[in-house]
């Protein structure tokens, strides 16, 4: 889960900032530039259309997940790109200590699905759900936002009355 930058006064310029883009806060892409070191979490990329991602210049690592967009929840499959060797991951690589089955699954997903395939398949349903429930559409096909007080427990930021709502249950139940 990335730290959101809507509250820039919380950022310590000497500490690494974890940022999710698209944002874990609302599932939308953000233009981001901060002066501290950054680890960029692109977990939601496979649940959006293809867009240019703003990568802060001082980003040291970028993560991608196959869990959310491709429905591989619990598999813990992802990729990490680093500017410098990662101390722990580099050591594991030297001993060939990684999940070969997971690597094969990632390879199969990448060969058989476009990165925006799930977004293209489900975007119209997301729009229908958002219209029916008076939600605001997110860049991620299974997320929406609302300021409806009923959803106050879903708020991700105490200083904001916007709630992030996962709409995937409505897909599963065939409500729409």
Report residues per predicted region.
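PLP-dependent class I/II
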Residues: 1-176
